[in-house]
Amino acid sequence: MGQVLPLVTRQGDRIAIVSGLRTPFARQATAFHGIPAGDLGKMVVGELLARTEIPAEVIEQLVFGQVVQMPEAPNIAREIVLGTGMNVHTDAYSVSRACATSFQAVANVAESLMAGTIRAGIAGGADSSSVLPIGVSKKLARVLVDVNKARTMSQRLKLFSRLRLRDLMPVPPAVAEYSTGLRMGDTAEQMAKTYGITREQQDALAHRSHQRAAQAWSEGKLKEEVMTAFIPPYKQPLVEDNNIRGNSSLADYAKLRPAFDRKHGTVTAANSTPLTDGAAAVILMTESRAKELGLVPLGYLRSYAFTAIDVWQDMLLGPAWSTPLALERAGLTMSDLTLIDMHEAFAAQTLANIQLLGSERFARDVLGRAHATGEVDDSKFNVLGGSIAYGHPFAATGARMITQTLHELRRRGGGFGLVTACAAGGLGAAMVLEAE
């Protein structure tokens, strides 16, 4: 066991997670069609503050993230402060770590708390796959810059004459890795082939995710942590996530064709997480500040770890790399955990990480560790379903997982929970949470 790194302030305070909330998650171009991520962020932070009745001046910092950024509002965090009635002097900045963005936001606020520069802050993220920054071609962009500098009409017309019809076509945001050109689904296909993960196994995990999520909603387990969203023209509120397939069967999954490797692939739209809109946020405080305000924390942040690996092959192995570090820093092992919540970007990616967490060979030959991190107990794993069912607004998923895990730990009488995710760029994140 390596060095334990307690997350406490100089006064010995633990980092308390006081409350968490999210919007319902909606599939692309459905309930939140036309609602920018900034508005979703304002929606959830405003409601979170209203529910907790925490005075606005108590919050000293807001760290928020957005993966698909809009050029007109590059600092979503500051826009949320200005758009929710928070104190205008509240420090606010934005972060981006792809699918682990709100993990990063939480870590940043925690570091400010430990440094003693603040005593309370908000962390979270929002993304919209329905409101996108549609760009222009590189050639058109260059011509427009040159036209802006041209002095005469003839010079401008000459510049425009260089363009062809194809140069005028809109350019949607890239869905591939900038450095490799590989799509996330291509990487999931790599992982399925590398680790021998079958189509049947992937479909079974996806089906399990939807069943567990549907059950969680039907039993009322998510009611406290998901707000009702009222969307223009305000005819019908959105109360629940709209991606969950409660009545599907395994046979339904088998009907879909591969989405990336059309001839030999096993990754489909059904065993992958969909493009989604939504926002989520959590309030963090020092333990003593929470007591001063008479607040009972949901739980505490025990440890966290971020890792990075090469992007060319099987890059979505973040959980297999970051989990042992987070456990080590928490002074725990896999067997000490009550719950394990892993982001399901793809069923193939999820199953590959589960396999490697229990692999002695991977631990020895790749991580340089004496023993495997530990087998994943199915009874502890994604007990309320995961991202395949709920959806994945990139920057919001981490805050969803943290809030959901802490609520479930409290229902079970407390314990330790692991939340972990892969992210684009070969990045990984893991956090250990504690509830009493």
UniProtKB/Swiss-Prot annotation:
It comes from the Bacteria. CDD domains: thiolase (cd00751). The keyword Cytoplasm applies. PROSITE patterns: THIOLASE_1 (PS00098), THIOLASE_2 (PS00737), THIOLASE_3 (PS00099). Pfam families: Thiolase_C (PF02803), Thiolase_N (PF00108). It catalyses: an acyl-CoA + acetyl-CoA = a 3-oxoacyl-CoA + CoA. InterPro entries: Ac-CoA_C-AcTrfase_FadI, Thiolase, Thiolase-like, Thiolase_acyl_enz_int_AS, Thiolase_AS, Thiolase_C, Thiolase_CS, Thiolase_N. GO terms for molecular function: acetyl-CoA C-acyltransferase activity. Its EC number is 2.3.1.16. It is found in: Cytoplasm. GO terms for cellular component: cytosol. One of its GO terms (biological process) is fatty acid beta-oxidation. The active site is at residues 99, 392, 422. SUPFAM superfamilies: Thiolase-like. The keyword Transferase applies. It is an enzyme of class 2 (transferase). Heterotetramer of two alpha chains (FadJ) and two beta chains (FadI). Catalyzes the final step of fatty acid oxidation in which acetyl-CoA is released and the CoA ester of a fatty acid two carbons shorter is formed. Belongs to the thiolase-like superfamily. Thiolase family. This is 3-ketoacyl-CoA thiolase. It comes from Escherichia coli O127:H6 (strain E2348/69 / EPEC). The gene is fadI.
